[in-house]
Amino acid sequence: MLSLRQRVMRRGLLCGSILCGGAHARPSSAAAAGSADGRRLPPMVPPELDDAQQRLYNTIVDTRIKVISKDALFDEHGGLRGPWNPEVASPALGQHLERLATAVRTENSLEARLYEVAILVVGVHWQAQFEWYAHEKIARKAGVADAAFPLMKVGAPAERLEGVLRPDEVAVYKLALELMETKRVSAATYAETKRALGDDDRKMADLCMTMGCYSAVSKMLNMFEIALPQGEPLPFPDRG
């Protein structure tokens, strides 16, 4: 039986064949520029990748398929959705951003429910469609209360999340919101959040690095206008 990666590569090879307009054909220059299919980057599919790109593609597939659905990970060409297509386009830098994002998930001193709250605050600030689309699902699985998502999506004040989120989640939300909105964190908010996290300096550092990582991801999603899977509603429809 073929592995998931082999099935994806076979799909990419088929798309690069005569059935899709010529062996290993990239999209036209108009498509690559975004005028034909809305893309600002062409899909990075296995038949067209150099060795470094292929290694990163394989790493992303192997790690991310454990976390998100195939529809969220792969596009119709066999390329990668989300921030992963730009990462594969420039693997020398992309591999390091991917390692950081993986470390946020696997080596974070914060519980997943806490760092996912912070990631969602970042996504709302940047109005990053794919960020919210992907991480709302992950946050729900991590145990964030269903009633919190409509409030977080509109950037509600932290006070409105009290009694909806757990106290430590409210503290993380408050600090994240304050940092994104004012570019600073007050002494009172910092002290309150640190207490809520058990006076743990490592957790405070990990919280900041998590937000920094996903600020970079959100900006990449917005710059390249990364689309959601077909038929998925936009989390921020007014942004387009």
Predicted regions and their residues:
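Short amphipathic alpha-helical segments and their helix-coil junctions
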Residues: 1, 94-108, 154-160, 186-196
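N-terminal secretory signal peptides
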Residues: 1-7
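N-terminal export leaders
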Residues: 9-14
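Secretory/endomembrane lumenal or extracellular ectodomains immediately following the signal peptide
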Residues: 29-112, 230, 235-240
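N-terminal hydrophobic signal/anchor transmembrane helix of membrane proteins
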Residues: 79-81, 94-98, 117-134, 155, ...
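Histidine/lysine/aspartate-rich catalytic loop segments that bind and position anionic ligands
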Residues: 138-166
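Acidic/histidine-rich alpha-helical segments that form the ligand environment
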Residues: 161, 165-208
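Acidic, carboxylate-rich catalytic segments that either coordinate divalent cations
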Residues: 193-195, 204, 216, 220-240
